Amino acid sequence: MSCRSENLWLELIAGSRKTSNFLWALILFLGSFAFLLVGTSSYLGRNWISLFPSQQILFFPQGVVMSFYGIAGLFISSYLWCTISWNVGSGYDRFDRKEGIVCIFRWGFPGRNRRIFLRFLMKDIQSIRIEAREGFYARRILYMEIRGQGAIPLTRTAENWTPREIEQKAAELAYFLRVPMEVF
């Protein structure tokens, strides 16, 4: 989502709170919990899942392996739920022509560097760059080239933009910032 006026461009960046992340975290949690439940029921010899008798799964080796996969899956699921609740990767890009300042803000993981805030002068922006890689893992990323700082990505690698969409966004941003556009 973006908001634009004559002198201000504000681009809101969606973080890890996407529908696909919610679905993967839920599926992983339910599957790993079921694995742990089957492994525990095979250890105790009780039938907690009515799909099959507990005597069919021996604790050693099947129950041990299923318990291990269940515990590992619960750890990965808890990691996904934490990134969703912290909304890692969300933030905004603010381009202010009136003040001549560009601000880039992102939320990170908890700790000393939870808030990632970058601030530049517009006169230090050399160009807007599109990096396109074709093939099996095709990706298109929009960068902002800063004098003395290198290239800063403005889009996520997970976003699959069509060539027309990324070119249009780059052209609009380059026109707004009054800098050239490069394609690699």
From Swiss-Prot:
Q: Identify its membrane topology class.
A: Multi-pass membrane protein
GO cellular component terms, semicolon-separated? chloroplast thylakoid membrane; photosystem I
Keywords linked to the UniProt accession: Chloroplast, Membrane, Photosynthesis, Plastid, Thylakoid, Transmembrane, Transmembrane helix
Localisation per UniProt entry: Plastid, Chloroplast thylakoid membrane
A Gene Ontology biological process in which this protein takes part is:
photosynthesis
Q: Where are the transmembrane segments?
A: 22-42, 57-77
Do you know which Pfam families this protein is assigned to?
Answer: Ycf4 (PF02392)
Q: What is the superkingdom listed in this entry's lineage?
A: Eukaryota
> What HAMAP family does the database record attribute to this sequence?
Ycf4
Which PANTHER family does UniProt cross-reference here?
PHOTOSYSTEM I ASSEMBLY PROTEIN YCF4, PTHR33288
Per the entry, what this protein does is:
Seems to be required for the assembly of the photosystem I complex.
Q: Which family does the record assign?
A: Belongs to the Ycf4 family.
Name it. Photosystem I assembly protein Ycf4
Report the source organism. Pelargonium hortorum (Common geranium)
Lineage of the native species?
Eukaryota, Viridiplantae, Streptophyta, Embryophyta, Tracheophyta
